[in-house]
């Protein structure tokens, strides 16, 4: 798979796990009352945008025949992110004052735990997809045929 376009898939593959890890850290800060909910809520949308860009660009760059596993992982990641967003909004609304009174306390605790677990799944899927992209995506500069005097070996080093 040739990595064309801007931003490149390889750069998104490096950036996305970091963005998700920052989001998880902000969520942990809110959970343990070190931060307010605003940093976690505010960073959720840029993090989601970066994740969806990675998944959508991977879907468009990966051919169905050669890279079916990348396409499946991208679709799974997009699905998980949408579920995580819905869980996050409902968990946020459950903590509002007055709280959601139609849900029992145990259901709210289960909702927050599900949001936390889905966040861990999003991080795991992001790392796995990023690793696959870094393994499969070839930068444009390396995909062009080398001249007779130049040979490329390994990860972009000249022989």
Language-model segment annotations:
Residues 1-159:
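Polytopic transmembrane helical bundles with strong interfacial aromatic enrichment
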């Amino acid at each position: 798979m040739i990595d064309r376009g801007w931003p490149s898939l390889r750069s998104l593959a490096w950036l996305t796990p970091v963005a998700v890890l920052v989001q998880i850290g902000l969520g942990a800060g809110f959970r343990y009352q070190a931060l307010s909910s605003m940093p976690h809520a505010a960073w959720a949308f840029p993090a989601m945008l970066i994740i969806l860009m990675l998944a959508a660009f991977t879907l468009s760059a990966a051919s169905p025949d050669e890279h079916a596993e990348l396409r499946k992982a991208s679709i799974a990641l997009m699905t998980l992110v949408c579920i995580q967003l819905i869980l996050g909004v409902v968990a946020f609304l459950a903590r509002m004052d007055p709280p959601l009174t139609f849900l029992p306390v145990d259901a709210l605790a289960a909702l927050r735990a599900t949001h936390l677990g889905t966040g861990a799944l999003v991080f795991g899927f992001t790392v796995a997809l990023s690793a696959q992209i870094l393994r499969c995506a070839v930068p444009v500069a390396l995909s062009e045929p080398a001249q007779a005097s130049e040979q490329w070996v390994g990860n972009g080093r000249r022989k």
